[in-house]
Amino acid sequence: MPTPWTLLERAVTPDGVLELRARGERDLMISHDGRVLMSSRIHRSELAVAELGCAPIADRKAPRVLIGGLGLGFSLRAALDALPATAKVTVAELNPVVVRWCEGPAAIVTQGAVKDRRVRVVIDDVTRCIRAAASGKEKPYDAIILDLYVGPIDGRNAHRHPLYGDAITAAAHAALSEGGVYAVWGEDRSRSFEQRLERAGFASRFVLARGGGPRHAVYVAEKKKAATTRGRSSRRREGGTV
């Protein structure tokens, strides 16, 4: 008989009810209003979005990385493993309870990633952090990684979406250094989001991440020099699986 899940903590937040459950010491999951958001057993896509986002800029002298969404900390752990000791990583997380979980019972599955000296966690909306860099209030980032509860979607008003619409996608482009990378996790492929990346000036590719669970989408978009994108489409129709 399978070991039952134990409820470790339940938190009512402005976004809904978050629950942390455990089955043994290293088998953890976070749910939102009863829907499983992340699991310590199935997290290949979380690793992939961070690995793909950090790989192109990992050899920079002191790369600056912004991660939107903490979850169980797997994307943060993957980013830290890919980046040099000189890197500075800012994690924007809306819910303080999630940070506390990652510092406490969930720390074991990421070797205490949130307490790494390269990491700064802010309780804030990641779009505010993006806009601060886009406006020059903060230094530009070398990589921006979004690993949030929901990914890009298609639909009538998708271009106005606060996380993946035209305005914030353009802001992400402005918030990046030259050659910087915008890596975004998604549940499914969104053709309209790919078009928004193109309109913002990114050269992008779409990758399927799979490993012990359903395939999820990872968008890897690079900010190109103006001279290399002028006069031709900046969109790359590459694909792949990781």
Name what the model sees in each region.
Residues M1-S31:
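N-terminal auxiliary segments of SAM/dcSAM-dependent transferases
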Residues S40, F74, S192:
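Residues that form or flank phosphate/diphosphate-binding pockets in enzymes
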Residues H43-L176, V184-W185, A200, R205, ...:
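The AdoMet/dcAdoMet-binding core of the Class I SAM-like
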Residues D188-A200:
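Short alpha-helix
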Residues Y219-V242:
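C-terminal lobe and adjacent flexible extensions of AdoMet/dcAdoMet transferase-like proteins
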